[in-house]
Amino acid sequence: MTGNQGKARREIVQTAMAMVSESLDLVSGSRRLCALRHEIGASDSELFYPIIGFESETDIYPVGDARAQYSQGYLQQLDQELEEYLDRSKPALVAACKRIIESLG
């Protein structure tokens, strides 16, 4: 493992831990994990499948500064849709984060 891979691995574990503790929202966290998994050579790892699926299903929802580009009414609609999806998917996503922590931590 190279130094960069070790750093990325630590960042993955820290991100997953932040998602489990709810100090990082699941959408932002999943986007970060999907980007970092390539840096450790885990592009096709089954460990990340739930995260990849969640990220794919939520890529239309703006976070952070991107929200400023949308009308308030549309943001309310998107936020409602996202909340409903999170209610259904959160348990599986948190379980996936815990597996990542156990496997890579």
PLM-predicted stretches and their roles:
Residues M1-G105:
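Acidic, Ser/Pro/Thr-rich low-complexity regulatory regions
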